[in-house]
């Protein structure tokens, strides 16, 4: 595993013109942040040794390098999901490669179903913590020596970055929520009973990604900021049939606000 990570990192280092310390994983319907990137060059996942390939509509499947404002960044346009059939090692492989490339801060975004009764479709939620409801743990197996065997997760989402994001949202007049994200396997959306259970467990929003990558980032010593766009509601009395197209539409409508916060925050890190 370590050899494969290092082989992939060595290939990318040979292609890279910059040395970013900031990475972004762009989720469902939120990939248009790449339109803000200047001086960019792209590498398709299919050209990268050992890299999985995304199969989901709305996930393009390429690494993008360039500048966001004055900051050198790398962005994953298209992430890998456990429900696609990948192992947890494959889902989180890119984060380990990021560590080899010198990434220090990771920004993640996703689409999520809101279970907090105060949430509305289109809200942005800053992730303050998460619940791991996946059936497999990304650190199961032999410990890769990027971090300890038993990593601390008491601050999985960096409090300093959360505070800065709050300041930016206030300056820009953008409404943001705060909440706990629960990560599940998918690919089904939740039943009303599951929404109710997750809410009882303390979650504010639910989705099918993010948690594995955040766990591995923390293991690697990479600090994390995460944000969800609430694309559907799992609140009793407000639950309706949901399609992937509905999720993408809601995410696309909220995208300009998320882009503003992410761009400003990345440039203040």
Placement of each model-derived feature along the sequence:
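Generic non-transmembrane alpha-helical segments
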Residues: 11, 15, 160, 164-174, ...
């Amino acid at each position: 595993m370590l050899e494969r990570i290092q082989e992939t990192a060595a290939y990318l280092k040979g292609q890279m013109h910059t040395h970013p310390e900031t990475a972004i994983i762009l989720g469902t319907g939120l990939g248009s942040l790449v339109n803000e990137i200047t001086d960019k060059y792209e590498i398709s996942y299919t050209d990268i040794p050992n890299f999985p390939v995304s199969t989901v509509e709305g996930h393009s499947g390429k690494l993008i390098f360039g500048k966001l404002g004055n900051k050198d960044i790398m962005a994953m346009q298209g992430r890998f999901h456990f429900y696609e059939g990948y192992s947890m090692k494959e889902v989180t492989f890119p984060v380990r490669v990021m560590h080899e490339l010198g990434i220090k801060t990771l920004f993640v975004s996703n689409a999520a179903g809101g279970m907090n009764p105060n949430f509305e479709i289109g809200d942005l939620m800053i992730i303050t913590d998460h619940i791991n409801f996946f059936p497999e743990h990304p650190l199961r197996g032999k410990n890769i020596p990027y971090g300890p065997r038993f990593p601390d997760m008491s601050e999985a989402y960096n409090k300093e970055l959360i505070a800065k994001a709050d300041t930016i949202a206030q300056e820009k007049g953008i409404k943001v929520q705060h909440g706990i994200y629960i990560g599940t396997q998918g690919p089904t959306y939740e039943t009303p009973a599951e929404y109710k259970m997750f809410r009882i467990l303390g979650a504010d929003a639910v989705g099918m990604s993010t948690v594995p990558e955040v766990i591995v980032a923390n293991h690697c010593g990479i600090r994390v900021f995460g944000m969800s766009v609430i694309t559907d509601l799992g609140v009793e009395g407000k639950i309706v049939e949901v399609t992937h197209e509905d999720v993408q539409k809601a995410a696309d409508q909220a995208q300009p606000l998320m882009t503003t916060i992410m761009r400003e925050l990345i440039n203040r890190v």
